Amino acid sequence: MVNKLSNLIKEMRNRTNLGILECKKALLENNENIELAIQFIKKSGTLNIEKNVNNLSNGIVLAKVKKEKKYGALIELNSETDFVAKNKQFQNFGKEIISIILKEKISDIDILRKFMKEKISYFSLTFKEKINIKRIKLFYGKNLFNYIHLKRIGVIVDIKNSTEDMSKKIAMHIAASNPKYISVKSIPNIIKENEKMIYIKSALKNGKTKEIAEKISNGKMKKFFEKIALEEQFFIFDDTKKIKNIINERNIYIKKFIRFEVGENFYPVI
């Protein structure tokens, strides 16, 4: 039980950047259900309490995959201003960080921050503003592909039976469309149930019958799935087809992905 809670706390810290005590409290108050715990802290506004380095809104996202495509890393490095984010020294510092993550296989952000403490202090003094390694992800897979959009959005996808061109297009789609899950099936039931209940309650409140409310909720759930499930989204390079049509036609298998965008509060859910 202790190990399970510890693992949940670690995962929640990675996804929210909150401290150990805040994560533990949220998990215990929600029967150790991580999805409910995250919803709980969203509603409580806990994520907005810390107006410090974790809330710097400028910066860069970088991604790198090793040559053998078995593992890669994604980082968000923050600064106070866009001016510093565009500085070559700052961007090179980001590249140095990602190289260290891959070389040492560092997955714990606290260890990385401690490892880079002196350099972070140096660059903070150099630029005269706060610098923060907001989040990192050491990502393992079978055939990884990465894509960076303007150093603002980064994606790594584990994809099988795909050409280089199609892998890039799918990664670009993920960057542009911001899905949270691969498929409807992969969305936790608690999220689907809560979302549907919101639509049903809204329809009933507006005087609809239960039957009509159910139909309305089904239609809205379809739109909801198109927004957050990769396979349900229309492909940005061919909007007559959904991603699921593209991958089925080509026998492509997308095992997992991760997406970072500068300024986000949470990790995208894989």
UniProtKB/Swiss-Prot annotation:
Keywords: Cytoplasm, Elongation factor, Protein biosynthesis. It is found in: Cytoplasm. Its main location: cytoplasm. Residues 81-84 are annotated as: Involved in Mg(2+) ion dislocation from EF-Tu. CDD domains: UBA_EF-Ts. InterPro entries: EF-Ts_dimer_sf (IPR036402), Transl_elong_EFTs/EF1B (IPR001816), Transl_elong_EFTs/EF1B_dimer (IPR014039), Transl_elong_Ts_CS (IPR018101), UBA-like_sf (IPR009060). GO terms for molecular function: translation elongation factor activity. Coiled coil: none annotated. GO terms for cellular component: cytoplasm. SUPFAM superfamilies: Elongation factor Ts (EF-Ts), dimerisation domain, UBA-like. It comes from the Bacteria. PANTHER family: ELONGATION FACTOR TS, ELONGATION FACTOR TS, MITOCHONDRIAL. Belongs to the EF-Ts family. This is Elongation factor Ts. It comes from Wigglesworthia glossinidia brevipalpis.
